[in-house]
């Protein structure tokens, strides 16, 4: 066994990933029937619909005072995001830090940056583009417009969000 970091949005814990904005909206739009019929592809279908909608303006304020604005934010407590995709190059689920990618622009930029990240081994602080990569212990997200949230692939309400480090969780791992 080992202990991994556990973070929470408004007191709701998550282990691996979270998202606010387009990612959260994609999960919100994904129905149980879609998941049964299309499996993981259901999220792609819902994501295409979410990207046709107006994206909220999000403001992430970290515990060390950084303020970042964007249209969508994904959080990773480990390198992987949504299965085998390695999107957070610097993430480590035992370091006490939550990694975040703040997308500055809406849909086309998010898609382009995500595809480039997959090719380049994930997002990291040394690569520049239409996003900012930050590492934090706690923070908050405010929104102008509807900003759905997801935690580990489940819809978890809407912003505003208070992000906290909820402690450690013992897991069985190889």
What are these regions (language model features)?
Residues 50-54, 94, 133:
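A short catalytic or substrate-binding loop motif that flags glycine-/basic-rich loops and adjacent residues
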Residues 1-71:
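Catalytic core of DAGKc-family lipid kinases
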Residues 34-41, 89-110:
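Gly/Ser/Thr-rich active-site loops/lids in small-molecule metabolic enzymes
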Residues 23-26, 68-69, 81-84, 108-111:
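Short acidic/glycine-rich loop or secondary-structure boundary segments that cap or lie
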Residues 19, 23, 74-88, 155:
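Glycine-rich phosphate/pyrophosphate-binding beta-alpha loops
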Residues 13, 98, 169-170:
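Hydrophobic residues embedded in beta-strands of well-ordered beta-sheets
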Residues 62-67, 92, 102-174:
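ATP/nucleoside-binding phosphotransfer catalytic cores, i.e., glycine-rich phosphate-binding loops
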């Amino acid at each position: 066994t080992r202990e991994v970091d556990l973070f929470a949005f408004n007191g709701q814990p998550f282990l691996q990933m979270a998202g606010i904005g387009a990612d959260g909206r994609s999960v919100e739009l994904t129905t149980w029937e879609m998941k049964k019929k299309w499996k993981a592809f259901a999220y792609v279908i819902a994501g295409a619909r979410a990207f046709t909608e107006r994206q909220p303006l999000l403001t992430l304020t970290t515990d060390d005072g950084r303020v970042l604005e964007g249209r969508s934010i994904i959080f990773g407590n480990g390198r992987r995001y949504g299965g085998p995709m390695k999107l957070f190059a610097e993430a480590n689920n035992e370091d006490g830090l939550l990694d975040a990618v703040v997308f500055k622009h809406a849909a086309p930029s998010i898609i382009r940056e995500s595809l480039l990240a997959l090719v380049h081994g994930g997002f990291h602080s040394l690569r520049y583009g239409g996003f900012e990569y930050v590492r934090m212990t706690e923070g908050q997200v405010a929104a102008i417009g509807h900003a759905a949230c997801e935690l580990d692939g489940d819809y978890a309400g809407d912003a505003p969000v208070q992000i906290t480090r909820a402690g450690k969780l013992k897991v069985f791992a190889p």
